[in-house]
Amino acid sequence: LEIRNLEKSFGNKQVLFGVDLTAQQGHILGLVGKNGAGKTTIFHSILRFLDYSGEIRLGGKAITQETYKEIGYLPEERSLMPKLTIFEQVRYLAALKGMSTAEVKEKLPTWMEKLQVKGKLTDKIKSLSKGNQQKVQLIITLIHEPKLIILDEPFSGLDPVNTEVLKQVIFEEKERGATIIFSDHVMTNVEELCDDILMIRDGSVVLSGPVQEVRNSYGKTRLFVSNDFSKEELEALPHVTKVTMTKQGTWKLI
């Protein structure tokens, strides 16, 4: 996935400013930022839920209706139809990604076991706990084996046990060769799972690079394009022991 110079405005308010992003195949990219920083707007732009200026390409191609079938998306706001059964709900949305009923019947039990969903295929969505409903939503995201997986706050609301289950599934999808992007407020999740990190503040990218490089970058320089990025926020980054401003107006992290 490649994004170049992505910009977005709602009315007279600009919310994304020249965002560049690269997510490699078989890699996990962590998108970090406060609420309102622009993370979900980036996701919605990739999915073409919004008009935007800039360039977004998946596998070198623009996102089209056919390309969209190669994307799996877990929204921050989970939305399922309470009166449908688990099977009906998954079949309905998987069909939009090109899956047949027979394929859903074959794959759904395996996914329910993998994610430890407590329930039967014939159980109504409304009868499930919130945690199990979230797992069903995740099955819908992954069952068609998408090339690009977008997870908006995937660990929100999960207990520690189910968080570890989801982390294992994310690793397995990476091994399958999927490109994965997820947003999170918790740096420990990003450090544990991600190959690369992109930090966004007020619609602008303020930090990007390999997580391993950030973790081991004692004494190396990081450049930030946002001059109002606070020293306290930088000092909160993993393994940063000292933050100083250079004469050029960039931050040096040690």
Pin down the residues of each PLM region.
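Conserved ABC ATPase "signature" region
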Residues: 91, 95, 102-120
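The feature captures the beta-strand-to-loop junction immediately N-terminal to the Walker
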Residues: 32-34
